[in-house]
């Protein structure tokens, strides 16, 4: 089974880079460019994993996460948050949930792979 991953970032270059990399790893990729699209696509497609920028137009990734947690169909989707800001700066808005991780931009593909491999099983994904 191929993992379906939803990327949400308002920077189209970052989205394109992540999409290309994840497709090279045989994942199916969806993209969103703001918080509203993230919420809509997550509810519609129910991906195995969400990779979300913290600050996006429409709604912060962390705010959308809170909305997704209230929906029985999306509450178990693991989320990898990414941001140019440090974890220390964001610790008050990042959820304290074992199904989430955080990477500071620029992210390395090794760190990305590690987080994906940790998070996918937490949402029930079975390869």
Give a label for each model feature.
Residues 53, 83:
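Active-site residues of response regulator receiver
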Residues 16-24:
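Charged docking surfaces used in two-component/phosphorelay signaling
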Residues 8-9, 32, 50:
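Conserved sequence signature across two-component system core domains
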Residues 107-116, 124:
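C-terminal output helix
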Residues 34, 60-66:
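Acidic catalytic/metal-coordinating carboxylates
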Residues 15, 57, 87:
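The feature encodes the CheY-like receiver
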Residues 26-33, 41:
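Short hydrophobic/Thr-rich beta-strand motif most characteristic of the beta2 strand and flanking loop
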Residues 61, 70, 84, 92-103:
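As written
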């Amino acid at each position: 089974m191929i993992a379906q991953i939803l990327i949400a970032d308002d920077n189209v270059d970052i989205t394109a880079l992540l999409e290309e990399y994840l497709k090279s790893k045989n994942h199916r990729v969806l993209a969103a460019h703001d918080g509203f699209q993230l919420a809509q696509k997550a509810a519609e497609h129910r991906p195995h994993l969400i990779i979300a920028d913290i600050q996006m137009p429409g709604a912060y990734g962390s705010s959308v996460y809170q909305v997704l947690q209230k929906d029985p169909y999306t509450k178990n989707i693991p989320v990898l948050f990414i941001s140019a800001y440090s974890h220390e700066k964001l610790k008050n808005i990042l959820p304290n949930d074992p199904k989430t991780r955080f990477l500071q931009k620029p992210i390395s593909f090794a760190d990305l792979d590690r987080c994906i491999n940790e998070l996918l099983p937490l949402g029930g994904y079975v390869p």
